[in-house]
């Protein structure tokens, strides 16, 4: 009898391994909602998670962090994981396009906090609370537009329900 070889688990999972397979398996005749969360870019960081890693000597060190070899290495590894996350989001966007639903799909990309460095995550400094919040909705949001309005994650669920036509 044939047996499938088991793959060793990824020693440095991104948390995005199931994103595209999940999207491929969705019922194509129904609307869909996916909340995709990643491990990237959370600690502990791993080396070599992208083909061309960021070089510590090339990173920009924020003025509130010490500019030393340890900080530079930590920032480079953080940027590597952000890059891997970006690549995985790109794969999802490619799959949405391949399925022919890109023009009728609302995509939100958010982060719950700033990067996990001193004076960032868990603080009320801008570096802790100014986090990405992108929306792609071709029917309603002009590409490359920006907003200076205050946004909060508490608005996400009601907004999604309203978009879906659910009375709240």
Q: What label would you give each PLM region?
A:
Residues 15-19:
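Extracytoplasmic mature domains of secreted/periplasmic and thylakoid-lumen proteins
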Residues 1-10, 22-168:
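Active-site-proximal cap/lid insertion segments
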